[in-house]
């Protein structure tokens, strides 16, 4: 490796460690909210008759989704601010504040992501609570990791897209850059995606287990197959166009 390549790699690794803070905070808040609500549901199940039990089980997914939404919403501004600060040096002056613009639309973005995920998670929650009436911590951790990846990457993409719209100098547009965690746990298809750079409104290409190609906006994109989406640890970084 050349000295320049080593410097760039070190810079990228330091950045990765820093941006992981946004993911970790969101993941912890989502997991904590899920554990608390599921524990409350389990406690209720122990004190009711069969009719009430069924009603509680049927509403479990909606209740957990509401708590996830609430937990994620408290972290929105810090995620958007981090995305803005990372891209700021690569952009130019703006016609208005991009952060406020994204934050104003963030609630509907989170609602969309949570609703999509809970379509699949609700059935699993129902089955697990019906069978065991216990909080499955491994399942909670998996949902929290997947959702945090999706939400952070989506808000990053929205932030950079808004920055591009508000740029005074359109020659300095921001692109997005896919980075895997680059360890022995990274999936082969995600390792192949590592280093891809596309326009903010462009699509990344990932191979899937069937040998086909999947297009996505970011890590954790709902368009991806479960094998490419669940428990993904990849991140995005802005690049100057």
Q: Where in this protein do the model-derived segments appear?
A:
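N-terminal leader/targeting and assembly helices and adjacent pre-domain segments
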Residues: 1-171, 224, 239-241
